[in-house]
């Protein structure tokens, strides 16, 4: 534990010099965090940046995403690859609306029951 405590200031200093200003670091909205986590799976940050904010402008909530045709979500996903993630995001949004009143749950087990959300993604959503 001592080694971690000693490295903490060094890591913070390094991050302060090297950090990138990424839009998903400026939000505490669980939906926005989920969208970013799914977009970033096996996809370069440079590909995600132009899509992320446009996606959230069009679908700022799970309810907005759930109400749109799946084809529109997949079309907006174009260029990110692995369209199954877009399908799962849409299905997950529909489930969130149907089972949780449109708000992402703040419970690990409930998040894991949503399509496309695994342990890492669920914990990332809960961290914010």
Protein language model annotation of sequence segments:
Residues 1-114, 120, 124, 128:
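N-terminal polyanion-binding entry modules of DNA glycosylases/AP lyases
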